[in-house]
């Protein structure tokens, strides 16, 4: 199994509501053993150059394991950010030599 990083992006004007933490917890729970690292929320955001298109910001990242890119995308398809007009960037993790 390969590892994939999920970068979660939301519209720049997004504000979470009271149900947001429970929604994320349920989604992470549904990933089961595919969730390698729940990751962290990003509390502040800045960028240099073109990153993810205008009008969105990164709010968190996680790492999952999957057979291939299609399987990783299938894991991301029900992510809560999609409900609010955001997106999930998915990419394979390249392990460092000697790690």
What are these regions (language model features)?
Residues 1-99:
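Conserved, structured core segments of small domains
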């Amino acid at each position: 199994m390969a590892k994939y990083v999920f970068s979660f992006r939301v519209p720049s004007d997004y504000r979470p509501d009271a149900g947001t933490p429970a929604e994320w917890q349920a989604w992470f729970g549904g990933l089961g053993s595919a969730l390698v690292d729940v990751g962290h929320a990003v509390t502040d955001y800045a960028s240099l150059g073109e990153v993810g298109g205008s009008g969105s910001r990164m709010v968190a990242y996680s790492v999952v394991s999957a057979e291939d890119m299609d399987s990783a995308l299938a894991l991301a398809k029900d992510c809560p950010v999609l409900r609010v007009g955001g997106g999930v960037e998915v990419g394979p993790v390249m392990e460092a030599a000697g790690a």
